[in-house]
Every structure is written in C-alpha cells, then in structure tokens.
A protein has these predicted regions:
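Membrane-interface catalytic loops of GT-C/OST-like multi-pass glycosylation enzymes that act
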Residues: 66, 111-114, 212-214, 276-287
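Transmembrane alpha-helices of multi-pass inner-membrane enzymes
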Residues: 120-123, 137-141, 263-272, 277-319
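TM-adjacent membrane-interface loops and short helices in multi-pass inner/ER membrane proteins
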Residues: 160-220, 224-231
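Membrane-interface "helix-start" segments
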Residues: 252-262
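A membrane-periplasm/extracellular boundary helix in multi-pass inner-membrane enzymes
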Residues: 43, 47-52, 105-110, 127-177, ...
C-alpha cells in the first residue's frame, strides 16, 4: 500500500509543480532552492569522507544508502553540466564547472558502481547534443589518461574488487573475469524474477507481491507483467520525446542548459535503474519529477512572459510640425 502511495506522490509532485508556477520569478526561486539543496548535500557528503565510510545522504542514521545518494548526485550533476555548457560567459562557465566538481567529489566516495555507470550515458548525451561537446570529450580523455593518478584509493579498490580481486568471487563472469558476490547476488535476483514472471506473464504479482530485487525494469516486469512494463516504457519514451522537443525549442535561450542537462540526467536515470529501484526512491524521484514538470511547462512559461515595451521618445513625426506627433523608437 505504501509503495503505491509513493508512486502516487511522484505524480502529485509533478502536477503540483505544473499548476503552481505561473511566472519566471517563481521558477527561478524554485530552481535556486533545488541547486542550493544539492550544494549543501554535496558539502555534507564531503564532510563524511574522513570517516572512511561510504558517503551517503544526510539524516539517514547509522546505515545509509550510498547508491541512492549517488543516483541523486548524478541527476543533479547532469543539470549543472548542462548549465555549464550553455553558459554565455567564461566566469559563468567556471562557476558551473566548479559546482560540478563539488558534486563529483562525494559521488566518487559513494563507491556506488551503479551511479558511476549512470554517468556514462549522461556524458554521452551531452557529447551528442551539445555544440560544446569538445569540452566534455576533453575532460573524459583527461580523466581516462590520468585518472589512476588522482583517483582516491577507495575508488580504485572498489573497481578492483568488482572484477580483479581474488576473493569474494561469484558465479558470473564479465569478459572472463568473475564478478564479486554482491553483483552476483543481484544477478541471481534478476534470474529469480524472470523465473517468477514466467508464471504470471501478463499482469504480474502486484506491487511488492514478489521478492525484493534491485533492478527497476525486472521489478516492474514481475510486479506488473508485460502490460505494466509496456506502460512503464511508454511513459519513459514520452518523457524523453517531450524533453527532446523542449530542448530543440529552447535552443539559444537562457533555459537551453536546463533542458540539455535534464535530457542527460534522464539518460543517467535509465542506466541507474538497471541496478537500482531508481523510479521508486524518494530521494531521486522527487527532484526528478519536479524537474520533469519544469521542463514540461517551460515553453508555455517562456512564451507567456511579456515582451519588453518599446521606449517612447517624444520627437516630431516626419512631415509634422512641432508637437504634432510622437515617434515610437525601440531601444
């Protein structure tokens, strides 16, 4: 029941946002609040690094969820990079890239492999869609060339543990290398999910009607069947198509970066949900549906803003005597 309420909550967030923003000033305040929240969360994450534990979100108690915090950080990182690539001046670009660096630090220390993988389609989307793609390509090449020199030891150890360690190996292999037991357990849950789905292929077992599994697509398939999975994929397709149209429509405007970053963040969430229940997690979905609502209403909001009125300068009209006309001269 409460899982169903969570799904309903996200649509409530979407419709509340769409119906409550009527002018750009409201939009700017809400976006500023979202970005400030991201900055504060990133700083709190950085402060956790000296403890030696995996970085997680604030106020989670003793056992946090680094994977979900990493998903949130990847989503917001995409928005920030979108703003950076669309910035018109060098100081603004530097400011946005500094903000991005602030997010990358705790993202690395979450040690969330799913979140790291989600950054790949995010960067690829920015490379494909942004005219300034060379900046991203250059940054990626530098990271690949010198990453082993400046990457934190815990990050390198996490990578090695996944594929190269000699202990805690599971039954599955990637490229000839056996993966760790954690990844193997996740793959086992997927296999169990498919085995269960075969018994109820069309409508599934209902929400929470099957065992827990950390994979959104498999979970939807098992709980809602083929019909539910088709509806879920259709929803994702409609979100992408709408956002892509908005991105084209707002090209060159002050919201180009937001639309571009949202598309990249959406691509990241698709990858993230392969290894997590991304579209259920409150920490990720509340900002996601908030941003989705903003992207949806942006074209109407920008069009509805009144255009600046031309200045009226008192001057004689052509062919008229003094005081017989006022010519409207645009600034």
């Amino acid at each position: 029941f409460f899982f169903v309420l969570k799904y309903i909550e996200y649509f409530v967030v979407f419709f509340m946002t769409v119906n409550s923003i009527h002018e750009e000033r409201q939009l700017q305040r809400l976006l500023a609040t979202a970005l400030a929240t991201c900055a504060i969360s990133s700083l709190i994450g950085i402060l956790q690094i000296p403890s030696g534990e995996r970085v997680s979100a604030p106020f989670e108690g003793q056992y946090g969820e680094p994977n979900t915090f990493g998903g949130y950080l990847v989503l917001m990182l995409a928005i920030i990079l979108g703003y950076a690539l669309a910035a018109k001046t060098l100081p603004r670009q530097i400011g946005w890239y500094a903000f991005a660096a602030l997010i990358v630090i705790p993202l690395l220390f979450t040690l969330s492999r799913t979140s790291w993988l989600a950054a790949i389609p995010m960067l690829l989307t920015l490379i494909v869609l942004s005219p300034r793609r060379l900046i991203i390509i250059g940054g990626v090449l530098l990271a690949l060339a010198f990453g082993s020199s400046f990457m934190p030891k815990s990050v390198i150890d996490r990578y090695n543990y996944t594929l190269n360690a000699k202990v805690d190996r599971g039954d599955y292999a990637i490229g000839g290398a056996k993966v760790d037991t954690s990844t193997s357990a996740r793959l086992d849950s997927w296999k169990q999910g498919f085995d269960g789905w075969v018994k109820r292929p069309f409508f599934g077992y209902g929400v929470t009607g099957f065992g827990f599994m950390d994979a959104q697509f498999v979970r939807v398939l098992v709980e809602a069947g083929l019909f539910g999975l088709a509806a879920f994929i259709w929803l994702l397709y409609r979100i992408w198509r709408t956002a892509r149209g908005v991105c084209r429509q707002l090209a060159g405007s002050r919201y180009e970066g937001l639309a571009l970053g949202y598309l990249a963040g959406f691509a990241a969430m698709i990858m993230h949900c392969i290894g997590a229940n991304t579209f259920i997690i409150v920490r990720i979905m509340e900002p996601f549906w908030f941003l989705t609502a903003i992207i949806t209403l942006l074209p109407a909001l920008v069009v509805s803003e009144p255009a600046p009125q031309p200045a009226l300068l008192a001057s004689p009209a052509v062919g008229a005597g003094p005081g017989h006309g006022i010519a409207a001269i645009p600034r």
